[in-house]
Each structure stands twice: as structure tokens, then as C-alpha cells.
Design a protein with these regions (language model features):
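Short N-terminal "domain-start" leader segments
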Residues: 2-25
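Helix-coil modules at protein/domain termini and other flexible surface or pore-lining loops
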Residues: 3-4, 45-46, 56, 81
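Short, intrinsically disordered, low-complexity terminal segments
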Residues: 8, 54-55
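RNase H-like nuclease fold core
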Residues: 24-27, 36
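Solvent-exposed strand-loop boundary residues in beta-sheet-rich modules
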Residues: 32-34
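A short, exposed loop/beta-hairpin motif centered on an aromatic-Gly-Thr core
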Residues: 36-53
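Short arginine-rich
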Residues: 59-72
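Short, charged, intrinsically disordered terminal tails
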Residues: 70-81
Length: 81
């Protein structure tokens, strides 16, 4: 799990269990509210057999996030997706 701080948001990479393994995700939460975090699937929704594999993919994706918009959308580096 990795954490990245932005101007108004915080993002955390993680793996979440799914029926047949794990998915890589990035969760984003606005700092000044109690709103629920938004979860974004990364790695094109690929399923991994091991949680550690999904976490590596999620951490790699998080390094390519430049900023989070005011609406909580991920803003990626150029050519990242």
C-alpha cells in the first residue's frame, strides 16, 4: 500500500478481493470532508492471483497520478493510460 498527498485529496493504492483473486485499486478521499472515499480500478480491471501482485500494480499506477481534480477524478501524467 502506498499513499500520495495532493492539494485537497489523499490517495491510497491497494488490492481488493474479488471472486477469483484481487484487483488493483486507488482510493481517493477529500481531506476536508467526511465523504466516502472514491475507489478507482486500475490495471484495466485485471485480476491477480495474489494480493501482493495487485498491490504492486496499484502502487505503480499511483506513481503516474499527477493530481486529483476538485471532483475527485484522477489526473494522470501524459501518456500514462
Amino acid at each position: 500500500m502506498a499513499r500520495k498527498h495532493f492539494e485537497n485529496h489523499e490517495a491510497i493504492s491497494s488490492a481488493v478481493p474479488v471472486d477469483d483473486g484481487f484487483e488493483a485499486v486507488i482510493a481517493v478521499k477529500r481531506r476536508d470532508t467526511d465523504d466516502t472515499a472514491r475507489v478507482f480500478k486500475v490495471a484495466n480491471g485485471r485480476h491477480y492471483d495474489l494480493a501482493s501482485e495487485a498491490e504492486v500494480a496499484a502502487e505503480a499506477a499511483l506513481t503516474k497520478v499527477r493530481e486529483v481534480s476538485n471532483d475527485g477524478e484522477l489526473i494522470w501524467e501524459e501518456n500514462a493510460i
